[in-house]
């Protein structure tokens, strides 16, 4: 599915197509692209822009695409310029003309911005989950080392003795503040 270049008479050089393609890196947004498209299809149906039947058909089609990608039945290939083109072509192939109505009232740039926001939100949550797991380990180390001593450091020099619990407690407190950053 070609998105641009309709008025040109010659075939676009493969180097240009490769330069413009983003499928190699934006395919990681497939879940977010589907999530945003399902929400958009719901809105189109609720607003009466498309019929409820078409909205449901689009949502079901997108849900089946997600299931097939995650099960390995459907592979995202580089024959498409980007993840949005892949999704649209696959949806139209599965549900017919109703799939063409998904982009009503939404530009690809809107889609890219939404996909990136959703992806970033999901990745921040994943990182936060990892930090929480790390904090549990640190807390265990603290509890196990209340009476274990080590040299404290100041200006990269050995200083007064501190407990391992106190040392690790400083890191625990730093990680506790992670919510203010996010």
Model-derived regions, located:
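A helix-coil-helix interface module used to build multimeric assemblies
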Residues: 1-179
């Amino acid at each position: 599915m070609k998105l641009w270049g309709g008025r040109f008479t010659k075939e676009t050089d493969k180097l240009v197509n490769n330069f413009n393609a983003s499928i190699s890196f934006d395919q990681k947004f497939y879940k977010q692209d589907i999530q945003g498209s399902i929400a958009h299809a719901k809105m189109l149906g609720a607003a009466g822009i498309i019929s409820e039947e078409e909205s449901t058909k689009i949502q079901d089609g997108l849900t089946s695409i997600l299931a097939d990608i995650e099960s390995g039945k459907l592979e995202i290939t580089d024959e498409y310029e980007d993840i949005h083109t892949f999704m649209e072509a696959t949806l139209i192939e599965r549900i017919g003309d109703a799939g063409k109505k998904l982009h009503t009232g939404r530009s690809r740039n809107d889609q890219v911005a939404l996909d990136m926001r959703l992806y970033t939100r999901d990745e921040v949550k994943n990182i936060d989950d990892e930090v929480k797991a790390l904090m549990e380990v640190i807390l265990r180390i603290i509890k196990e080392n209340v009476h274990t001593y080590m040299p404290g450091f100041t200006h990269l020099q050995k200083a007064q003795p501190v407990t391992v619990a106190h040392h690790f407690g400083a890191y625990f407190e730093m990680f506790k503040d992670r919510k203010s950053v996010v």
